[in-house]
Amino acid sequence: MKSPIVDVHSIPVLPEIADSVIRMALDEDMSVSRVARVIEKDQALTARILSLANSSFYKRSRQVGTVKDAMVAIGAEAVRTLALGLCILNVFPSRRDGAFDHKEFWRHSIGCAMYAEAMMNRVSPQLGAKAFCTGLLHDIGKLVLDLTRHEEYRAVVEQAREGSRPLDEIEKELLGTTHAEVGHDVLAHWKLPRLYEESVWCHHAPVQVIDEDQFRISGIVNIANTLTHMTGIGGSGNSYPQLVPGSLLKKFSLSETVLDELMASVPRQIDLICEEIGIGKPAEGLFGLVNRASMRLSEISVKL
């Protein structure tokens, strides 16, 4: 346990289909047919997977009609990751009185996931889907803290809105833990692969003493999280100005030109995905996001 204040028994239980999908994600040798059978046990999940596979995001000329076809069309790893993400998306009901806007939280998480995958495809393509999943889950500890320590976490978020200190610093001071530590424990409780647990735990402070894949994923998610904040995609309670970590950019050979390209293209993709899965469009239009991203790009501070 990384967090001393969250009782794992208070963490929402994963539904049976989610548990099956997690076991499926753990078994990389599972055949396409078996993966398809697991997903097709849940009609709603199947419908959402097919909707995404047929969406304009994947730019397919021909429609797919089965999960197996979707795995062939967009890749088995992509379907596994989407299934896992969609299952977890449904575990936490949105709260109208939440410490933060839960819909905007998921928009931020999806944005981070998509930036992470896009960058990882340039750095280590074999880790692209895992970077997506980690990006999606990187702030899951915030939802658990809002659920289990609601009033205390509301006070944390209210302080963070002032923008004078990072959210995780305020969490540590007021709660004795951080959302990254809680996120680690949530994923451990759900028995997700250890790679995800450790990468979520380290996403604010990637350290190279851990496994190389974990370092790459946590480092890329760190950069992706910054880009998501800079382009104003969703919100997760942190108003502290974000810095692009120059040491990580150098480590992964990512130039500011690459960041420029991503910040110009990824927001449109995020809008498409969010609309497909029912989160809807952001309050600010697409062009507002892109224009603001362009203005902010010139203000990037690279932390050396």
Give the positions of each predicted feature.
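Conserved alpha-helical "signature site"
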Residues: 1-242
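Divalent metal-dependent phosphate-bond-processing catalytic cores, especially two-metal-ion Mg2+/Mn2+ enzymes
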Residues: 188-198, 217-304
